[in-house]
Regions:
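Glycine/proline-rich active-site loop of Rossmann-fold NAD(P)-dependent oxidoreductases
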Residues: 120, 159-164, 187-196
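Flexible, glycine-rich beta-alpha linker
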Residues: 118, 150-169
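N-terminal Rossmann NAD(P)H-binding glycine-rich loop of SDR-like oxidoreductase domains
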Residues: 2-26
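Alpha-helical substrate-binding/gating segment
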Residues: 176-216
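Conserved Rossmann-fold NAD(P)-dependent oxidoreductase catalytic core, especially the SDR/UDP-sugar
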Residues: 7, 27-29, 35, 77-144, ...
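NAD(P)H-binding glycine-rich loop region in Rossmannoid oxidoreductase-like domains
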Residues: 30-95, 99-102, 189-192
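Substrate-positioning beta->alpha
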Residues: 93, 134, 152, 170-186, ...
Length: 216
């Protein structure tokens, strides 16, 4: 079993991922900003680590991830200010990648979104631009990192019940957060997904089968 560190540990997807991983026997360290969230992290099977990712240097990130087998980046500004979006979704994300490399943690999973690409087409005067551009830049850094990376790129998230099945066939534009968590957990247990961007939404293909096909 592996020792995984999850950034953005109090987010909905991260909490669900922590529960799945802990139930499968993995050890999960959840990085959170607020110590008051610690009890909820423990209730989901994780061990809280309090750190403000906006204030961490490269050295700080390297020390946070050192000793773990894998990094999951599930942090985000969550619709905050533009400055905070750049600071978390781009700058802190990039530092986490560089920190993993510096610390010798080879496995890295970035939680992104299905539209993330440098030619995303979002106008600069659109409120969504900072997020779209931040994710595209961070994902590009992940791909060029030399790490054993996987980018998990779901479509629009919902709080519907998880189904355990996904697809990428245009039949849906949404996916439950629980299924995203399932994909993240299975990606960590499927080495063949390294070097791939996994785009998906709700569907009828069991997650394990979907990932095996994507990893071919």
């Amino acid at each position: 079993m592996s020792n995984v560190i999850v950034f953005g540990g109090h987010g909905k997807v991260a909490l669900l991922t922590t529960r799945i991983l802990s139930e499968r026997g993995h050890t999960v360290t959840s990085v959170i900003r607020d110590a008051d969230q610690s009890d909820e992290i423990r209730a989901h099977g994780g061990e809280p680590r309090v750190a403000d990712i906006q204030q961490q240097s490269l050295t700080d990130f390297a020390e946070l991830v050192r000793g773990h087998d894998a990094v999951v980046w599930s942090a985000g500004a969550g619709g905050g200010s533009v400055d905070r979006t750049w600071a978390i979704d781009r700058d802190a994300a990039i530092l986490s990648v560089q920190g993993a490399k510096q610390a010798g943690v080879d496995r890295y999973v970035m939680v992104s979104w299905s539209g993330s690409q440098l030619d995303h087409g979002v106008p600069q005067d659109d409120d969504f631009f900072a997020y779209a551009q931040s994710k595209a830049i961070a994902d590009a850094v992940v791909r060029d990192s030399g790490l054993q990376w996987t980018i998990v790129a779901p479509s629009t998230l919902t709080d519907d019940d998880a189904t355990g099945s996904v697809d990428w066939d245009g039949s849906s534009t949404e996916v439950p957060r629980g299924d995203v968590a399932h994909v993240i957990a299975d990606v960590l247990e499927t080495p063949g997904t390294a070097g791939n961007t996994i785009r998906f939404n709700s569907g009828s293909t069991p997650v394990a089968d979907f990932l095996r096909a994507d990893a071919v």
